[in-house]
Structures are given as C-alpha cells and as structure tokens.
Amino acid sequence: MSKYQAIISFEMDEEFMTLVPPHRTYINYLLNKGILDSYAVSMESQTTWMTINANSKIEVFDLLDKSPLSKYWTYEVFELFVYDSQSTRLPTVQLN
C-alpha cells in the first residue's frame, strides 16, 4: 500500500454547502477506516489536501469520486515518497 497526496481545488455555491454534512460523514468514514491519514481545508484558497492510503492512483480517484462534493472539484494526485509527521512518531520519553 502506498500513500498519496490529493490536492483539490473547489468553487462553492448554495448547493455545495448543503452537501458538506454528507461529505463530512464520508470523510469521517475514511478516517475511521485508516484510508485517510489527514484532511485539511482552506476556505481562503478554496483548496483541500488529503493524504490517502491506497494501492494505486486509480483507487484514489475512485475514493475521491465517491464524495458528494466531487462534482465541484478539480484535483491532482501524487504518490508520496516520504511521509513524516508528529503523529507518526513515538512519544518523547519523559524521565521521572
């Protein structure tokens, strides 16, 4: 299994906002299943970043296309060579 970074641009309208709750349900499902490692949205730039665990780019495209918001998106997907974050590291040892 590989990690992929999806960079998604979107434009909003009234219908977009009505689809946010079912989209969040889908995102929570992906997070709970360990398919999605991280999810971030900037309303300022109307961009979303997702780090996704999948076997191929095609699988990532299929996952993205299942979102209720997918018709508002244009996106690029890149396979990651390195993925490091605070949450993937062991906790710091604290001596008493």
Q: Can you annotate each of these PLM segments?
A:
Residues 1-96:
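Conserved, structured core segments of small domains
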